Regions:
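Phosphate/pyrophosphate- and phosphate-bearing ligand-binding catalytic cores of soluble enzymes
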Residues: 54-190
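Anion-binding (especially nucleotide phosphate/pyrophosphate-binding) glycine-rich loop
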Residues: 1-51
Length: 190
């Protein structure tokens, strides 16, 4: 990820700081801050456990959806490699699709910003939540988050306390709620 940003490749910059390896990304459809790998995966080398067939499969084969794929629902096998389609946008990001990032940097939803600014902002936000591994901080060790932030109607979002984090969505009648806030305020601290 750092290499992609340093070399002006856009499409994964908002996933900075997520722990793990490339081969695991299709399983969870890893993502964060408005980006997910299904947006940039073109094909995957896949060894089907059931048939023993080694084949290059298109992204559609994995039935990606929000933090989900067929690999979590019975499709078993080994991922050899993943091909990503990244974009060269003169050092700019893809249009930002995260209310958290746009609020953090003071930009409009859909803005294209310098890749390094997006990466730095994501790392800063993730660090503030204890979600970036730091050598001298044992509390930062994490395997990443496996929950999804719930999306509710705007009217439903008004039923939650005002101090709860929430972010606007492209559909103005929808609001993304902070799963982390909900979990911590249900009595399960970090």
């Amino acid at each position: 990820l750092a290499w992609a940003v340093e070399n002006d490749y856009a499409g994964i910059e908002a996933m900075s700081g997520i722990p793990g390896s490339v081969g695991a990304t299709p399983v969870q459809n890893v993502g964060g801050y408005g980006q997910e790998v299904s947006q940039v995966i073109t094909q995957v080398e896949f060894l089907d456990q059931e048939t023993g067939e080694l084949a290059i499969k298109p992204a559609a084969f994995f039935e990606f959806s929000y933090r989900d794929s067929a690999l979590k629902h019975g499709l078993l096998g080994i991922i050899g490699w993943v091909e990503f389609r990244l974009l060269k946008l003169d050092g700019l990001s893809v249009p930002m699709a995260s209310g958290q990032i746009t609020q953090h940097v003071g930009a409009a939803y859909g803005s294209q910003l310098p890749l390094s600014q997006i990466r730095d902002s994501v790392l800063e936000l993730r660090s503030s939540k204890g979600m970036v591994v730091k050598a001298n901080d044992p509390d930062s060790v994490s395997c990443g988050s496996f929950f999804t932030n719930p999306v509710v109607s705007y009217s439903k979002s008004l039923e939650f306390p005002e101090e709860m984090q929430r972010w606007s969505m492209p559909d103005e009648d929808q609001v993304k709620l902070s799963a982390g806030w909900l979990i911590e305020n249900a009595g399960i601290p970090k």
